[in-house]
UniProtKB/Swiss-Prot annotation:
Record-linked Pfam families: MatE
Entry function: Multidrug efflux pump.
Membrane topology (UniProt): Multi-pass membrane protein
Annotated TM spans: 21-43, 58-80, 101-123, 143-160, 167-189, 199-221, 251-273, 288-310, 323-345, 360-382, 395-417, 421-443
PANTHER family on file: FMN_FAD EXPORTER YEEO-RELATED, MULTIDRUG RESISTANCE PROTEIN NORM-RELATED
The name this protein goes by in its record: Probable multidrug resistance protein NorM
InterPro entries: MATE_fam, MATE_MdtK, MdtK-like
Protein origin, superkingdom: Bacteria
Species: Xanthomonas campestris pv. campestris (strain ATCC 33913 / DSM 3586 / NCPPB 528 / LMG 568 / P 25)
Keyword Metal-binding: no
């Protein structure tokens, strides 16, 4: 969605900033919803094909996310770079920067391909059941071919978002869903003359969908008048290692930060899985609901990155802080709604997922824990987004490491496994880690933004 770069003079500046950020964030939130729906469709198709297929796709998807987090996080630095160039009136520099980001995305896509090729032979050593390994291997071997397309797609997406144009994220997200659902069904079950591929079919459908989305985005950028002046594809340009190195210096810490947070939740799920099927199922329900709630602050944080970066580029430190506070205001409101829904409706929500009384009872309790971390989760992701807009990424990386792996994971494992508190203990660790990250990231933005504001004072 396109939004104005400046606020109307007749409108109070803060209220206008809230509106601008909200309009910018809405397509991003809906884009994340489409991603969640793709995961839902994968599970439905696989689940109806068979328990073994569902288990294979679940394992394969979890392993797919690990190599995805670092490239996606690394490339998101392009959003802040582009937004700052737009704010500074230096849009001529965006085309060359984008072409170097494409080279970087090619390398990151190749690394994804290599990881997904190397992991399947190791599955038996991870304790994966022997009957699941073949299906998970087939899924990973198929989906790996979409790795380069995925990184190209996110490179183009972050360019577009940095230009204050977020509508393609939503449209291509739902477009991908429309491609994946029928294609996954046909290839998984073997319909319309195609062979039945099971879990491999979903991997093939996912890879094809990634390429369709990437090609569609490239055609849009090439043909759109909105981007014509950037001359994105007018000529070939070899890699310039200095420019790529600058992108990595800003982006790689973001990728590691995203991996630290994502890894916390992945390892927590694995540890809870050791406690039993009831505990694992209850945790999966609670974490799925939490992820749905998280889509809103994540989209607002991405919009805040753009707004903060634009203010930095135009040399407006007060506007930079106003953009961040607008993001905080939106997130505090949305998280209050999410927490209230979880507190008041946790039993009803669980009833949608399961009829198993033991699973429902535990999941209902875990949703109360999820309600508790709505505010710290929203604040930490918003603070991280604001810091990305400042291109302040190295210190936040260490703050994330300390919060999630120095505090959250040790405490969760100690309480959940060491003291026998079970999933509740692990979730206390999640709450502590997210709360520590929220406090430290918030203080970091406060410190950095105040320094920039003071430095700009006459």
């Amino acid at each position: 969605m396109s939004v104005p770069h400046s606020s109307p003079s007749a409108t109070p500046r803060f209220a206008a900033e809230v509106r601008t950020t909200g309009l910018l964030a809405l397509p991003l939130v809906l884009g994340h919803v489409s991603t969640g729906l793709i995961g839902f469709v994968d599970n439905v198709i696989a689940g109806h094909h068979g328990t073994a297929t569902l288990a294979a796709v679940t394992i394969g998807t979890s392993l797919l996310w690990l190599p995805m987090l670092v490239p996606i996080g690394t490339l998101i630095s392009l959003t802040a770079s582009v937004s700052q160039l737009v704010g500074a009136g230096r849009e001529r520099e965006i085309g060359p920067l984008f072409r170097q980001a494409l080279w970087l995305s090619l390398g990151l896509g190749a690394l994804m391909f290599g990881f997904l090729t190397a992991v399947p032979p190791l599955l038996p050593t991870f304790g994966i059941a022997p009957d699941i390994v073949p299906g998970a291997t087939d899924f990973l071997h198929a989906v790996r071919w979409g790795g380069p397309a995925l990184t190209f797609y996110f490179c183009m997406r972050y360019l577009s978002e940095g230009m204050h144009w977020t509508l393609p994220t939503m449209l291509l997200g739902f477009g991908g869903l429309l491609v994946l659902a029928p294609l996954g069904y046909v290839l998984t079950y073997g319909k319309f003359g195609f062979a039945e591929h099971g879990a491999q079919g979903l991997g093939m459908a996912s890879a094809i969908t990634m390429w369709v989305q990437a090609i569609a985005f490239a055609l849009y950028l090439w043909r759109s008048r909105r981007f014509a002046h950037l001359e994105l594809f007018t000529h070939l340009e070899g890699p310039r290692w200095r420019a790529i190195g600058e992108l990595l210096r800003t982006g790689l810490p973001i990728g590691i930060t995203v991996l630290m947070e994502g890894g916390l939740f992945i390892v927590t799920a694995l540890l809870i899985g050791r406690l039993g099927s009831t505990e694992a199922a209850a945790h999966q329900i609670a974490i799925n609901v939490s992820q749905l709630c998280f889509m809103i602050p994540m989209g607002v944080a991405e919009a805040t990155t753009v707004r903060v970066g634009h203010a930095v580029g135009r040399g407006d430190p007060l506007g930079m802080r106003r953009a961040a506070w607008a993001g905080y205001a939106i997130v505090l409101g949305t998280q209050a709604v999410s927490a209230s829904i979880l507190l008041l409706g946790h039993d009803a929500i669980v009833g949608v997922y399961t009829n198993d009384a033991a699973v429902a009872a535990l999941a209902s309790v875990l949703l109360l824990f999820a309600a508790t971390f709505q505010f710290p989760d929203g604040i930490q992701v918003l603070s991280a987004g604001a810091l990305r807009g400042l291109k302040d990424t190295r210190v936040p990386m260490f703050l994330a490491m300390f919060s999630y792996w120095g505090l959250g994971m040790p405490l969760g494992a100690g309480l959940g496994l060491g003291l026998g508190w079970g999933p509740q203990g692990m979730w206390i660790g999640l709450i502590l880690g997210l709360t520590a990250a929220a406090i430290l990231m918030g203080l970091r933005f406060r410190q950095t933004s105040r320094r920039l504001t003071a430095g700009a004072a006459p």
